[in-house]
Amino acid sequence: MEERTLVILGATGSIGTQTLDVLKKVKGIRLIGISFHSNLELAFKIVKEFNVKNVAVTGDVEFEDSSINVWKGPHSIEEMLEALKPDITMVAVSGFSGLRAVLSSLEHSKRVCLANKESLVCGGFLVKKKLKEKRTELIPVDSEHSAIFQVIEPEVEKVVLTASGGALRDWEISKIDRARPEDVLRHPVWNMGARITVDSATMVNKAFEVLEAMELFELPFEKIEVKIHREGLVHGAVVLPDGNVKMVVSPPDMRIPISYALFYPRRVALEPFFLRTISLSFEDPDPEKYPAFFLLKEIKDSYALRTAFNAADEVAVEAFLKGRIRFGGIHRVIEKTLEEFQGYPQPRTLDDVERIHFEAIKKAERVTEWLSSTSY
């Protein structure tokens, strides 16, 4: 089998490093390029271990090596992808900047493995337009969307996305508001980055995933359900018209959906999972415990509101992790920011989306400043 070429965007992050783990175990893909933001030490280690000859640096750090092609600056990812035109691009860049990375990956790759949420949440219309133009393969990497991708059929009654409920799922509602960062970062199932772990506790992460599912699978909002599933074994399910339910069950290991996206339609051997005596539970999310998640109905049909929602969450989570606001303040920042964007016209271009994002960042920062100066 001919070796395919791969670029990993965000190679030093959680999904990036787990993608590298897969490459160590399974042959058939050659890593030809990476991007990273600021983890210089790990980037050098990856370059040396995988003999990478192309690097895009998006942060303000100096990467110097005369034997390597290095691109720097805000357009470094686009420039590297245009030069390399890889068979596969793993988009593991986190945050809003992932939207440009995804669009460029779709332009210059044959397959895009998507592990960035914001690109579909904020710019789903742009991603789908580019997909139609280029006919690139888009394979989801999120465990929930990977599961649905594997079992979806032309006609479904419901699609079910599972959620852990986050680190505070068993806390009394009266105490959640004052949870500390160290409490929130103790995720019961997954080992992830800080922002996504906080987003799991607020279930903002699951709100993003509902919006992603709407875009990826062309589903109406009403056909998507979210259930809290404590065991972390069922990643997604589809309810079929004849009463059958198809679900994907596997250990909570991101290397499984990563390998599926990289090697699809071939399944590669990782560690086998054998069924044992297990209990599976499914619960509805509590609106009092997860108020930010239930803003979904308000934002689902507006890319402007979706973009503002994401930007406000980004600001609020950072403020919480730095101790500037309480955990309960995250929802307040999002809600107050969204009020400023009610009736905002739908974006039509990437520039429109970026303008809304930066406007929302500024508004969310003002709300955060106000909250941090009060005892609310």
Curated annotation (Swiss-Prot):
<feature type="binding site">
    <location>
        <position position="13"/>
    </location>
    <ligand>
        <name>NADPH</name>
    </ligand>
</feature>
<feature type="binding site">
    <location>
        <position position="209"/>
    </location>
    <ligand>
        <name>Mn(2+)</name>
    </ligand>
</feature>
<feature type="binding site">
    <location>
        <position position="15"/>
    </location>
    <ligand>
        <name>NADPH</name>
    </ligand>
</feature>
<feature type="binding site">
    <location>
        <position position="164"/>
    </location>
    <ligand>
        <name>1-deoxy-D-xylulose 5-phosphate</name>
    </ligand>
</feature>
<protein>
    <recommendedName>
        <fullName>1-deoxy-D-xylulose 5-phosphate reductoisomerase</fullName>
        <ecNumber>1.1.1.267</ecNumber>
    </recommendedName>
</protein>
<feature type="binding site">
    <location>
        <position position="144"/>
    </location>
    <ligand>
        <name>Mn(2+)</name>
    </ligand>
</feature>
<dbReference type="GO" id="GO:0030145">
    <property type="term" value="F:manganese ion binding"/>
</dbReference>
<feature type="binding site">
    <location>
        <position position="14"/>
    </location>
    <ligand>
        <name>NADPH</name>
    </ligand>
</feature>
<feature type="binding site">
    <location>
        <position position="206"/>
    </location>
    <ligand>
        <name>1-deoxy-D-xylulose 5-phosphate</name>
    </ligand>
</feature>
<dbReference type="GO" id="GO:0030604">
    <property type="term" value="F:1-deoxy-D-xylulose-5-phosphate reductoisomerase activity"/>
</dbReference>
<dbReference type="Pfam" id="PF08436">
    <property type="entry name" value="DXP_redisom_C"/>
</dbReference>
<keyword id="KW-0464">Manganese</keyword>
<keyword id="KW-0521">NADP</keyword>
<feature type="binding site">
    <location>
        <position position="200"/>
    </location>
    <ligand>
        <name>1-deoxy-D-xylulose 5-phosphate</name>
    </ligand>
</feature>
<keyword id="KW-0479">Metal-binding</keyword>
<feature type="binding site">
    <location>
        <position position="205"/>
    </location>
    <ligand>
        <name>1-deoxy-D-xylulose 5-phosphate</name>
    </ligand>
</feature>
<dbReference type="InterPro" id="IPR003821">
    <property type="entry name" value="DXP_reductoisomerase"/>
</dbReference>
<feature type="binding site">
    <location>
        <position position="143"/>
    </location>
    <ligand>
        <name>1-deoxy-D-xylulose 5-phosphate</name>
    </ligand>
</feature>
<feature type="binding site">
    <location>
        <position position="144"/>
    </location>
    <ligand>
        <name>1-deoxy-D-xylulose 5-phosphate</name>
    </ligand>
</feature>
<dbReference type="GO" id="GO:0070402">
    <property type="term" value="F:NADPH binding"/>
</dbReference>
<dbReference type="InterPro" id="IPR026877">
    <property type="entry name" value="DXPR_C"/>
</dbReference>
<dbReference type="InterPro" id="IPR013512">
    <property type="entry name" value="DXP_reductoisomerase_N"/>
</dbReference>
<keyword id="KW-0560">Oxidoreductase</keyword>
<dbReference type="InterPro" id="IPR036169">
    <property type="entry name" value="DXPR_C_sf"/>
</dbReference>
<feature type="binding site">
    <location>
        <position position="187"/>
    </location>
    <ligand>
        <name>1-deoxy-D-xylulose 5-phosphate</name>
    </ligand>
</feature>
<feature type="binding site">
    <location>
        <position position="12"/>
    </location>
    <ligand>
        <name>NADPH</name>
    </ligand>
</feature>
<feature type="binding site">
    <location>
        <position position="39"/>
    </location>
    <ligand>
        <name>NADPH</name>
    </ligand>
</feature>
<feature type="binding site">
    <location>
        <position position="193"/>
    </location>
    <ligand>
        <name>NADPH</name>
    </ligand>
</feature>
<feature type="binding site">
    <location>
        <position position="209"/>
    </location>
    <ligand>
        <name>1-deoxy-D-xylulose 5-phosphate</name>
    </ligand>
</feature>
<dbReference type="Pfam" id="PF13288">
    <property type="entry name" value="DXPR_C"/>
</dbReference>
<comment type="function">
    <text>Catalyzes the NADPH-dependent rearrangement and reduction of 1-deoxy-D-xylulose-5-phosphate (DXP) to 2-C-methyl-D-erythritol 4-phosphate (MEP).</text>
</comment>
<feature type="binding site">
    <location>
        <position position="117"/>
    </location>
    <ligand>
        <name>1-deoxy-D-xylulose 5-phosphate</name>
    </ligand>
</feature>
<dbReference type="Pfam" id="PF02670">
    <property type="entry name" value="DXP_reductoisom"/>
</dbReference>
<feature type="binding site">
    <location>
        <position position="118"/>
    </location>
    <ligand>
        <name>NADPH</name>
    </ligand>
</feature>
<dbReference type="InterPro" id="IPR036291">
    <property type="entry name" value="NAD(P)-bd_dom_sf"/>
</dbReference>
<feature type="binding site">
    <location>
        <position position="116"/>
    </location>
    <ligand>
        <name>NADPH</name>
    </ligand>
</feature>
<comment type="similarity">
    <text>Belongs to the DXR family.</text>
</comment>
<feature type="binding site">
    <location>
        <position position="142"/>
    </location>
    <ligand>
        <name>Mn(2+)</name>
    </ligand>
</feature>
<comment type="pathway">
    <text>Isoprenoid biosynthesis; isopentenyl diphosphate biosynthesis via DXP pathway; isopentenyl diphosphate from 1-deoxy-D-xylulose 5-phosphate: step 1/6.</text>
</comment>
<keyword id="KW-0414">Isoprene biosynthesis</keyword>
<dbReference type="GO" id="GO:0051484">
    <property type="term" value="P:isopentenyl diphosphate biosynthetic process, methylerythritol 4-phosphate pathway involved in terpenoid biosynthetic process"/>
</dbReference>
<dbReference type="InterPro" id="IPR013644">
    <property type="entry name" value="DXP_reductoisomerase_C"/>
</dbReference>
